[in-house]
Amino acid sequence: MLNKFKISLIALTVALSSPALADFPNGYPSDYQKTVDGAKKEGKVVVYSTTDTKAAGPLIQGFEATYPGVKVEYNDMNSTELYNRYISEQAAGGTSGDVVWSSSMDTALKLATDYAAEYASPEQGQLPKWAVWKNKAYGTTYEPVVFIYNKRLIPAGDVPDSHEALAKLIASQTDKFKKKVTTYDIEKSGLGFMLSVQDFKADPDYFKRLADIAKGGLTVQSSTGTMMERVSSGENLIGFNILGSYAEARAKSDPTLGISYPKDYTLVLSRVSFITKDTANSNAAKLWLDYVLSEKGQSILANQADIPSIRNDIEGKNDIDGMTKMLGKALKPIPVDESLLEYLQQNKRLEYIKQWRTAAAK
């Protein structure tokens, strides 16, 4: 009896003195606990992101609850600011973000080309092949790009359901839409530039349609929030190239904001994430990336942050399967690959901006 007591006491002592086993998903590598233990020694992960802190809040809370002792230092900024800050810090050789998470897919991939660590996430088998680039950069979301409009001021019969319909509507009612249409300023917004280029690739008549839209005077902004606010207030009537995730979240509490998914083609954006090579918190960075891609993390994004999941096994309709059932063949995902880099070449970028400014009358 005494010996049994001693054995039990020893077992209890060992259990209490050993690190707690983390609650990571089944199917992860057998040595993944070493990554967890390493992350706890590092104590934090620094994330540079274009996803605002409020939207990312539930994800951060879920991560810190899953991995106690690993804090998330979350820095949100617009895509241009993120790119410039990261480049400057890397050039100076100082500390920077452990993880980059950006909606500007092209500039994120450009950064990944030079600065990403190679890491084969155990979650990559759950992702579409187009969302994984060289085990370095990962697409993390599945977000349709939409039109928004003011429900009070745009009759239901006038709501455009394609890019052609949008251009025809505005060109036929230039007085009504004079300075009432908004989109991104592609010179100030990295996301705006990338989406415009993707429109150009998808639509041979893109610049002609843009010129028709701009006949009444196009209002350009650098943020989605400003565009939604101005359409809701009536200062603008229609906005295009808006992230559907932000629009759907806003529309839940704003009955004035309408959303139209174009039926000719609907671009699908995927926020790109990568781990910085040689970063001080490499284990914590791996935990964060894996958590974002995991069923748990994706469920939080889809059902709490209103950001559609890139997986197809998430409860509810806010994932790839749900979007496919709603929009079918119109969906046009933007792949995470080298094609994103083409118009970041200086000569091509400048020439493209010149064409855009001519068509947009800017």
Question: At which residue positions do the language-model features occur?
Answer:
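Bacterial N-terminal signal peptides that target proteins for export
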Residues: 1-9
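Bacterial N-terminal signal peptides
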Residues: 8-17
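Sec/Tat signal peptide C-region and signal peptidase I cleavage site
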Residues: 18-22
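Conserved C-terminal helix/tail region of periplasmic/extracytoplasmic solute-binding proteins
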Residues: 28, 332-362
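Short, polar/charged alpha-helical segment
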Residues: 29-46, 50-71, 147
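Extracytoplasmic ligand-binding site segments that recognize negatively charged/polar headgroups
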Residues: 49-60, 72-87, 95-235
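A ligand-binding cleft/hinge motif common to bilobed small-molecule-binding domains
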Residues: 106-111, 232, 237-256
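Mature extracytoplasmic/periplasmic domains
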Residues: 271, 276-337
